[in-house]
Design a protein with these regions (language model features):
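Disordered, acidic Ser/Thr/Pro-rich linker "stalks" and the adjacent N-terminal cap
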Residues: 2-131, 171-182, 227
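A short beta-strand element within beta-rich, extracytoplasmic domains
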Residues: 84, 135-146, 204
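A broad, structure-centric signal for solvent-exposed, well-ordered loop/edge residues
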Residues: 86, 91-93, 137, 163, ...
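Trp- and acidic/polar-enriched beta-sheet ligand-binding modules for extracellular glycan
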Residues: 120-123, 146-227
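Extended extracellular/luminal ectodomain segments enriched in beta-structured repeat modules
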Residues: 121-124, 131-140, 198-200
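Signature of small four-pass
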Residues: 129, 136-142, 154, 159
């Protein structure tokens, strides 16, 4: 895909653009976006900057390339707590009750600012139910805001119905694709899905981590036009 601007609008009103390149974009490292008038260091927000068009609408038929991408709503809270779940949810008691799947929201701050997996192995997962079949075109991840804990790599599963088996997102060789994630607590790393996923349920499967599996995230929805 040629370089261009990913035009996106968060549901809470912040409007802006992501720069699309042929590789994953680390928007907290090489490109830092913040709408806060006095951003704090070293925590770097991965917000959308002001100043672009107001984009809306999405494409239900999967394109090979997505011309526009819109945040699904983790950060804005348009994605509600009942849409996000995780492995071993019934064991999130005591201290872990503050670090449940619902806390896996991009740019979350304060105590309980991320999802922390209670167990550190590759059997863990973070799941999103988008409530209807959508075209998902990208994933943005961050680590834990207040400690050096993050996910370094992951795979993706999806399905259109809860009664169907999970399907792994594959690479061009037919193997399960490995997505590379974070290398610090605050930078945002964006991985675009080419082709995008047409699905209702999405799972992130952590394959590597620093100290502990810790995730803040956003999903990107594919749109065919900006209106």
């Amino acid at each position: 895909m040629e370089e261009g601007w990913l035009k996106a609008r968060a549901n809470h009103g912040r409007i802006g653009q992501y720069l699309l390149t042929n590789d994953s974009v680390g928007c907290g490292t090489s490109r830092r976006f913040s709408s806060h008038p006095h951003p704090r260091a070293p925590e770097r927000s991965c917000s959308l900057p002001r100043g672009s068009e107001d984009c809306d609408g999405f494409l239900m038929r999967p394109p090979t390339k997505c011309p526009y991408h819109k945040p699904l709503g983790f950060e804005s809270a348009a994605v509600t707590p009942d849409q996000i779940s995780c492995s071993n949810l019934e064991q999130y008691t005591g201290w872990y009750a503050s670090w449940t799947a619902n806390k896996a929201r991009l740019n979350g701050q304060g105590f309980g600012c991320a999802w922390l997996s209670k167990y550190q192995d590759t059997n863990q997962w973070l799941q999103i139910d988008v409530k209807e079949i959508k075209v998902i075109s990208g994933i943005i991840t961050q680590g834990r805001c207040d400690a050096d804990e993050w996910m370094t790599k992951y795979s993706v599963q999806y399905r259109t119905d809860e009664n169907l088996n999970w399907v792994y997102y594959k690479d061009q060789t037919g193997n399960n694709r490995i997505f590379y994630g974070n290398s610090d607590r605050s930078s945002c790393v964006q991985n675009l899905l080419r082709p995008p996923i047409v699905s209702r349920y999405i799972r992130l499967i952590p394959l590597g981590w620093h100290v502990r599996i810790a995730i803040r995230m956003e999903l990107l929805e594919c749109m065919n036009k900006c209106v």
